[in-house]
C-alpha cells in the first residue's frame, strides 16, 4: 500500500501536469485566434480586385503578419494583426519597427503604409441598447 507522502506527491504531480496542459490549451487557443484573424484579413484583401495579400509566417521569424500589395495602384501594406478578449491590446515596439523596415524596403511602391489591425471579442446583444460580455471558453 502506498504511503501518505507518496499519495500527496502523486496528487501534486497530477495537479502540476493538469495545470500545464490547461495552460498549453489556452496558449493554443490564443494562437489559433490570431491565425484566424490574419487569415480573415488575407481573404478580405484577396476578394478585392487587383489586391494580393499573403500571410508571411510564424512569429519567430522577423516578418510582418500580413503583406498586401496592389501593383496597379503602386501600394504596399504591412499588417501587424492582433486579436484579443480584453478591452486593450498591446503591440510590442519591435513588431512595429519590423513592419516599418519591411515597408520602407519596397521603395518601388509609391504608397507604403503600416497597418495595425485589431480584433476584439464582441459583446452579446440582449436587448435594446443592452449588451452583455461574452463568456470566454478557453
For each of these PLM feature ranges, what is it?
Residues 2-57:
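Acidic-basic catalytic patches of nuclease active cores, encompassing PD-(D/E)XK
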Residues 2-9, 28-33, 113-138:
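Domain-level recognition of nuclease-like catalytic cores that cleave nucleotide substrates
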Residues 38, 80, 95:
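Acidic-residue sensor for enzyme active/binding pockets
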Residues 45, 66-68, 74-85:
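Conserved catalytic cores of phosphodiester-cleaving nucleases, focusing on short active-site segments
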Residues 55, 80, 116-118:
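Structural signal for conserved beta-strand scaffold positions within catalytic alpha/beta enzyme cores
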Residues 58, 71-72:
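Short polar/acidic secondary-structure junctions
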Residues 60-63:
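Short acidic/glycine-enriched loop/turn segments that link adjacent beta-strands
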Residues 87-118, 126:
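Short, charged, amphipathic alpha-helix that recurs within catalytic cores of restriction-modification
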Amino acid at each position: 500500500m502506498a504511503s501518505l507522502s507518496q499519495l500527496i506527491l502523486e496528487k501534486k504531480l497530477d495537479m502540476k501536469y493538469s495545470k500545464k496542459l490547461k495552460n498549453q490549451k489556452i496558449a493554443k487557443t490564443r494562437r489559433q485566434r490570431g491565425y484566424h484573424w490574419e487569415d480573415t484579413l488575407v481573404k478580405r484583401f484577396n476578394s478585392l480586385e487587383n489586391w494580393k495579400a499573403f500571410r508571411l509566417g510564424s512569429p519567430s521569424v522577423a516578418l510582418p503578419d500580413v503583406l498586401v500589395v496592389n501593383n496597379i495602384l503602386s501600394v504596399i501594406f504591412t499588417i501587424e494583426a492582433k486579436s484579443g478578449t480584453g478591452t486593450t491590446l498591446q503591440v510590442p515596439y519591435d513588431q512595429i519597427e519590423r513592419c516599418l523596415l519591411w515597408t520602407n524596403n519596397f521603395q518601388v511602391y509609391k504608397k507604403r503604409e503600416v497597418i495595425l489591425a485589431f480584433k476584439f471579442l464582441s459583446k452579446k446583444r440582449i436587448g435594446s441598447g443592452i449588451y452583455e460580455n461574452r463568456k470566454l471558453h478557453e
